[in-house]
């Protein structure tokens, strides 16, 4: 799973507009924005790639960060990649990016 769980309880309203991790989008709105179905988004949750936060009523809420990941998966699937393979590719890309970030940070601060 690609982490995106942050505590947003103490975040001001103005900060939420700029926070790419704030779970602002309902499943329906997220699916509409991505041009996909709610079922596709549920499948990403079932694959443990994206685990949206839940509202008090139990409804899924997606962040912009999660929507970018979902859009990348959709792109791979549209190119003929199986969903499970697309999820694995995204996970590996994320791990590579994180490793590169850690190396760059270490090189900057020996």
Please report, for each region that a protein language model flagged, where it lies by residue.
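Major-groove DNA-recognition helix of helix-turn-helix-type DNA-binding domains
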Residues: 38-57
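Arg/Lys-rich, alpha-helical DNA-contact motif
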Residues: 1-23, 32, 46, 51-52, ...
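Minor-groove-contacting beta-hairpin "wing" of winged helix-turn-helix DNA-binding domains
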Residues: 57-64
